[in-house]
Amino acid sequence: MALAEDTPTLAPAQIRRTATVTVGLLMGVWVIDYVDRVMMAVALPFIGQDFALTKTEQGWLITAFSLVYLLCQIPGGILADRFGARRQLMVSLLLWSVFTALTGIAWGLASLLVIRALFGVGQGLFPGASFKAVAERTTPGVRATAAGAMLASNQLGAGVAPLIVAPLILVLGWRHTFWVTAAAGVAIGVLLWKLLPKALPAHLNGSDVVEDKGLGLGAVMRSPSVWKFAALFCATNMLGYGLITWVPSYLLEERGISLINTGVMSAIPGLVMCATVFLGGWLFDRFFHDRARLYVIPLLLITAVLLVLMLMAESAVGFTVYQTLAMGVAGLSSMGILGMPVRALPPAVIGSGMGIVNVGGQIAGVLAPVLMGFLVDRFSYSAAFGLLIATTVLGALIALIVPQRPEQFSLGTKELA
């Protein structure tokens, strides 16, 4: 079908600029997102001491956020598809900045649980809107690379958070530190509102596909492909949530590392993973977009082996080296897991589709902190980290049944062979 005469056209340079500015801005927001999220793990020993919390209770502070964050994924994706990305990005950022600030005035376990749950509402509206914004402002051929760059900033935020938060806690205390990061969220929100480009025309970003095929939310919800990737993301995301939550406490309590050195040692794996997630997005787009299993399964098995070596390390340095290698290899696999739905879902329903996939990842966010806290209380840190080895191997097994190519990714009730 020929394009209408009034169909807008853009030069390649304009298309590239739209994608670059969009990804750059969203990377900044994701960094703040993860700093605000990870700082709770760094502050946990001090919050636990102030309020006399057990390890299980500390784990519930992370899980309260993660549970609400999970519940907001599908509604957040639906709202983004219905009302557009820009407005929802701003509402999300404003809400989570407010509740980050309110964390600093909490007076006990109950108030912390409520505030962190409401913080989860704010952050839970963000992922679907961010994927929607990327899909509207990129062409399908570069979408996994763009999404990989955006998601690499998760690990950048997770990496820099201990470097920023640990000194601030020492100088200002944990309460004032939450106020400082809340102010940073407001600042990046102003930049996002002023600088986010308009969406590309539908014939460039592919948002006319759903209209042509009559597909919508119902087809996404019934898609076995979407739910299989949600299960895969659940298994593999246990690693990130588990290590981010409990490694700082492990280094402080079991290895006797100072807070500043704990911050540095906790940052290194996240920064390496930031680079490998970005590289993984490029590798997937360039070489593996039609052979996802061949890419993901070996990487997950290598990750599991490195986690075993991490668990056996005799020194804190050895532990950090193997943790860094494990998270680096896991980072390479990330866009093999998320890149397929990012490439295959039409922009008009990508918010809903990625919301469902992200539900799987956030189930891991609910389970990992509290299960590992329970294992530490009842057994040891070794038992807790052993759980992550098992879930990583489980991810490799689930990868055997997910679609390998975009044309196998069905929005109907059956997958193509």
Predicted region positions:
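Cytoplasmic membrane-interface "Motif A"-like loop-to-helix N-cap segments
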Residues: 82-93, 285-300
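Extracytoplasmic gate region of multi-pass secondary transporters
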Residues: 40-41, 224-278, 334, 338
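Cytoplasmic helix-loop-helix junction between adjacent transmembrane helices
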Residues: 115-154
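Helix-loop-helix hairpin linking two adjacent transmembrane segments in secondary transporters
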Residues: 150-197
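Conserved MFS/SLC helix-loop-helix module at the cytosolic interface between two early adjacent transmembrane helices
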Residues: 71-107
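Helix-to-loop junctions at the C-terminal end of transmembrane segments
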Residues: 73-84, 277-289, 376
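Juxtamembrane intracellular "pre-TM" segments in multi-pass secondary transporters
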Residues: 7-15, 199-229
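C-terminal transmembrane helical hairpin of 12-TM major facilitator-type secondary transporters
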Residues: 290-337
